[in-house]
Amino acid sequence: MERVLSNTQMRAADAYTVKVQGQSAQTLMARAGAAIADEVEKIMKKHGFKSAVVVCGSGNNGGDGYVCAESLKNRGIAVSVYAVAEPTSEECILARKACTAEFTHEINADLIVDCIFGTGLCRDIGGKFAEAVNAVNASGAYVVSADIPSGLNGDNGLIQGCAVKADLTLVIAEYKLGHFLNDGLDLCGKTVKKDIGIICPQTTYAEIYSDDDLKPFFIGRKRNSHKGTYGSANIIAGSSEYLGAAALACGAALKSGCGYVKLTTAEMVKLSLVPVYPQVIFSDGIDFNSHSIAIGMGCGVSKDLYNKIIYILENYEGALIIDADGLNALSE
């Protein structure tokens, strides 16, 4: 399980680490830049890349880039810096002054490190910043984004004007909501989290689970067992308009390990489902003896569906999933 923070929560974690834990913002930037350089060095060795350019913005994400460039230079890697704009944050100003890497006016290298904007971006990108983003995307180079692809909103994963499409995103400290929402799923590429010592004081946050987190819930079946050993589910799904919804729902229930899957649906849906999942049992009504009930998928919004959901809510004590048209019916 990994924490997933909003932009506000991440800023609070940064402030807590600086003010309460006594770590300076410059120290955190030094760690972030070094962590980015570590990963860039690995990638360059793996792919045989000969050159890198770090594209730096004017804020702290740009500061991370200057530190990264200096670290790569000290390791003997051919690296240059493309400064999109003059530094504006105190930490970025100091990082640029300390950077002795060569500066360039071209975004052209085997590998590009995107340090233009981080999660602090609160406007659509335009002007020279948009030109830099578009140049990165048009370069054909391997692109590594620091924390989040520039131009991607850290809260909702939407593009703000334009955005970098990364091959790899090095997530600093904690994952952000934008990594997993909307355009973030297409722009982040592979994600790798880098711990730089930022402390998260929040106790309430979103979470994301990996395959390893979920494996304990999918136990192997014992030989001395039968379908009834592994629970039952009643799926109320599908209609003449949405034949496939029932198949998708039943398939998901079976893949979860459910022993008995009972489907309540229209006659034509039954005929289409038998060749796909012959083990599914058909039921004409609601089975309140099932361990779980799922309702709404492809049913079509109707008063009848609404009444069924209310009836189940009032009379059923097992696990209940209301999805798709079920939610739409309740909202009307």
What does each of the following model-derived ranges do?
Residues 1-83, 179-324, 328-332:
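Small-residue (G/A/S/T)-rich helix-start motifs and N-terminal tracts that mark the onset
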Residues 38-116, 124-146, 316-318:
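Nucleotide and nucleotide-moiety/phosphate-recognizing core
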Residues 87, 151, 268-269:
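Positions that flank functional sites
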Residues 92-94, 156-158, 273-276:
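Short secondary-structure transition/capping segments
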Residues 96-99, 160-164, 187-188, 277-282:
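Short, hinge-like loop/turn segments at secondary-structure boundaries
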Residues 106-110, 163, 287-288, 313:
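A short, aliphatic-rich alpha-helical micro-motif
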Residues 110-111, 116-205:
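Internal gly/pro-rich beta-alpha loop/helix module
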